[in-house]
Amino acid sequence: MHSQPYLLSPAPNNTPFPPAEHALREPNGLLAIGGDLTPQRLLAAYRSGIFPWFTEGQPPLWWSPDPRTVFHSDSIHLSRRFRRSLRTSTWRVRADTMFAAVIDACASTPRRGQDGTWITANMREAYLTLHQHGYAHSVEVFDGTMLVGGIYGVAIGRMFFGESMFSTHNGASKIALASLAYFLHTHSVPLIDAQVENQHLLNLGAERWPRRDFLTYVRRLITQTELPACWSVLFGEKLSRDLV
């Protein structure tokens, strides 16, 4: 167990990540500081069970907490009351049609208990690049032509690493998550990494896994066949009431 996080040099040196098991206990999961946000670095992080999380003015901070928060793609919990409300919903759901708008909304939507956003300008550009390379994806919820909710993350092999979701209308982020999960389950992607627990995620069915178990699954799933680089056609357009 290390008492200090590792220091990573920036590109082009590309210092490799240390094993995720070397992350600190306090703060839980902090593994490394520094490096960069190139696609190569980000993909190496996700493949190792590591993710970036820092705010404006900080160097890149890299995390792998224990326990890890995970969804089974076939086990998203929507309450009976919420499901009933969907029966009359006219909202529509698509994928990879407004990635930039989703990440911008995730950055700007106010969140209880948070004064700012961890989605910095550099972070935004990094994930836009990953999207252009076919690794980062979004699911979007529309009320007419208005984007009212969404979620984005990174897909590698048959593993999905969730990053953030937002909602400007009550329940829209739940619809985005449930629609994403249904799509992933249909295409043999069994897990969604949700990173760090909170009560909202636990209420939706997230589980707390020992990091060693999470890493075992990640190492296996990332080697499996990738989904298409763009999901829009494969996903199609769905009605939110189809989730009932």
From Swiss-Prot:
This is Leucyl/phenylalanyl-tRNA--protein transferase. GO terms for cellular component: cytoplasm. GO terms for biological process: protein catabolic process. The gene is aat. Residues 1-22 are annotated as: Disordered. Pfam families: Leu_Phe_trans. Keywords: Acyltransferase, Cytoplasm, Transferase. Its main location: cytoplasm. It catalyses: N-terminal L-lysyl-[protein] + L-leucyl-tRNA(Leu) = N-terminal L-leucyl-L-lysyl-[protein] + tRNA(Leu) + H(+); N-terminal L-arginyl-[protein] + L-leucyl-tRNA(Leu) = N-terminal L-leucyl-L-arginyl-[protein] + tRNA(Leu) + H(+); L-phenylalanyl-tRNA(Phe) + an N-terminal L-alpha-aminoacyl-[protein] = an N-terminal L-phenylalanyl-L-alpha-aminoacyl-[protein] + tRNA(Phe). It comes from the Bacteria. Its EC number is 2.3.2.6. It comes from Xylella fastidiosa (strain M12). Belongs to the L/F-transferase family. NCBIfam families: aat. One of its GO terms (molecular function) is leucyl-tRNA--protein transferase activity. InterPro entries: Acyl_CoA_acyltransferase, Leu/Phe-tRNA_Trfase, Leu/Phe-tRNA_Trfase_C, Leu/Phe-tRNA_Trfase_N. It is an enzyme of class 2 (transferase). It is found in: Cytoplasm.
